Amino acid sequence: MGQAVSYLTYTLRRCCKKNTLTTESGEVIELDDEHYDTVDLDDLRCSDPLMQPKFVLLKNGRRGKRNREYDNDHEKYVMMFNKE
């Protein structure tokens, strides 16, 4: 399972400028370029899992050509991770 979290971590870093993740306890974690390394996702996986680990909610991030229509809507799930 640590490998899946590592894939999630790698993908967040590569694709997104700012991300918001919600845990099962309701805590909202914002990951951006400045604070990215302060969040230990592997530790979080054991103590307070993410609500929907396959989905990431992008806010003010870069959009691809497919997601152009969502440029002004920051509450869309625009990225889905493959199950591996």
Curated annotation (Swiss-Prot):
Membrane topology per record: Lipid-anchor
ATP-binding keyword on record: no
Entry keyword set: Host cell membrane, Host Golgi apparatus, Host membrane, Lipoprotein, Membrane, Myristate, Palmitate, Phosphoprotein, Virion, Virion tegument
Subcellular localization(s) per the UniProt record: Virion tegument; Virion membrane; Host cell membrane; Host Golgi apparatus membrane
Any one GO cellular component localisation term in the record: host cell Golgi membrane
GO biological process: anatomical structure morphogenesis; viral budding from Golgi membrane
Purpose of the protein: Plays an important role in the cytoplasmic envelopment of tegument proteins and capsids during the assembly and egress processes. Also participates in viral entry at the fusion step probably by regulating the core fusion machinery.
InterPro entries: Tegument_UL11_Herpesvir
Gene (UniProt): MDV023
Subunit structure: Interacts with cytoplasmic envelopment protein 2; this interaction is essential for the proper localization of each protein to the assembly complex and thus for the production of infectious virus.
Domain of life: Viruses
Name listed for the protein in its UniProt record: Cytoplasmic envelopment protein 3
Ranges where the record places region Asp/Glu-rich (acidic): 40-46
Changes after translation: Myristoylation and palmitoylation (probably on one or more of the nearby cysteines at the N-terminus) enable membrane-binding and Golgi apparatus-specific targeting and are essential for efficient packaging.
Entry's family note: Belongs to the herpesviridae cytoplasmic envelopment protein 3 family.
